[in-house]
């Protein structure tokens, strides 16, 4: 029974990776933000870093979440954009 549950969980996880968008665009009044999802999957390697509740939409996602989580991760890794104009493009 444990093997069946583990197999189903793995299937759902892999399906999420297979059907995830390559790039997402988030509308913002000071310029849209293009998010290279596939690139982040490859670099971070752990979906739960952002998708804490599992595959799909991120609970609580919005400006405050993105600034805290995305910018915070970039600062922590010393890699990626951290200034407004680096992400927001008009």
Curated annotation (Swiss-Prot):
Binding site for heme 3: 67, 84, 87-88
Residues the entry annotates as binding heme 2: 40, 70, 73-74
SUPFAM superfamilies, A to Z: Multiheme cytochromes
Pfam families (UniProt xref): Cytochrom_CIII
Keywords assigned by UniProt, alphabetized: Electron transport, Heme, Iron, Metal-binding, Signal, Sulfate respiration, Transport
Disulfide topology: none
Extent of the signal sequence: 1-20
InterPro entries: Cyt_c_III, Cyt_c_III_dom, Cytochrome_c, Multihaem_cyt_sf
Binding site for heme 1: 37, 47, 50-51
Post-translational modification: Binds 3 heme groups per subunit.
GO molecular function, one term: heme binding
GO BP: anaerobic respiration
Keyword rRNA-binding: no
Keyword Nucleotide-binding: no
Gene3D superfamilies membership: Cytochrome C3
Family membership: Belongs to the cytochrome c family.
Main function: May be involved in anaerobic iron respiration.
Protein name: Cytochrome c7
Organism: Geobacter metallireducens (strain ATCC 53774 / DSM 7210 / GS-15)
């Amino acid at each position: 029974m444990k093997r069946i549950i583990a197999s189903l969980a793995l299937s759902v996880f892999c399906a999420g990776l297979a059907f995830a968008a390559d790039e997402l665009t988030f509308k913002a009044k000071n310029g849209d933000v293009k998010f290279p999802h596939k690139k982040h999957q490859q670099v971070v390697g752990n979906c739960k870093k952002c998708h804490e509740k599992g595959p799909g939409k991120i609970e609580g996602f919005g400006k405050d979440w993105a600034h805290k989580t995305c910018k915070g991760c970039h600062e922590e890794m010393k890699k990626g954009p951290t200034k407004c104009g680096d992400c927001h493009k008009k």
